Amino acid sequence: MISAIVLAAGASSRYGTSPPKQQELLPHVLAALRRAASLDDVLVVLGAHDVEVDGRTVRCPDWERGPGASLRCGLEALPASAEAALVVLADGPELDPRAVDRVIESWRREGGDVVAAAYGGVRLHPVLLARSAWPFVPDEGARGLEARLVDCDDLTPPGDVDVRR
């Protein structure tokens, strides 16, 4: 079983958005995950804001400690049958379900503790964490773990609304 974890616990304060950007962007991310053929479950990690979500959620009381704390909350909430977690960000509205499937299929074929999509050689999301990697998630989250990269150059990167263009 492979579960997706959507990190949506942040305060959304960088650009003073109101209502929280998670409310606007989450439906796009969740729709992309539901179109992916390789996922069995989706979990959204919330924290700073109460956000309406069409799906399963967990609240992270330590969300202010950063993405690692939010990711650990999500990992702890997954069922014992989960072999791996596919991590995505709530503020990546252009997530392509083909990238999700590509990362998962690469992990199934070649294994590895951490497998991430790369666009133009740059590591982005989604990032798959095999259960063996879960105990080692640092405070900065999955980006603090070395990953095997999967080429997604032919796909649009997931975007990040926190990056001004």
Where are the language model's segments positioned?
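Conserved beta-loop-beta/alpha segment of the NTase-like Rossmann-fold superfamily
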Residues: 64-131, 135-136
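Short beta-strand segments
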Residues: 7-9, 45, 88-89, 117-118, ...
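N-terminal glycine-rich phosphate-binding loop and ensuing alpha1 helix
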Residues: 1-49, 100-101, 105
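Short, low-complexity, intrinsically disordered N-terminal peptides in bacterial proteins
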Residues: 1-3, 109, 164-165
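Residues at secondary-structure transition points
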Residues: 17-24, 58-69, 94, 98, ...
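Active-site regions of enzymes building and remodeling cell-envelope glycoconjugates
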Residues: 54-62, 147-150
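Conserved alpha/beta core of the MobA/IspD/sugar-nucleotide pyrophosphorylase nucleotidyltransferase superfamily
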Residues: 134-165
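A short, conserved beta-strand element in the Rossmann-like catalytic core
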Residues: 14, 52, 93-94
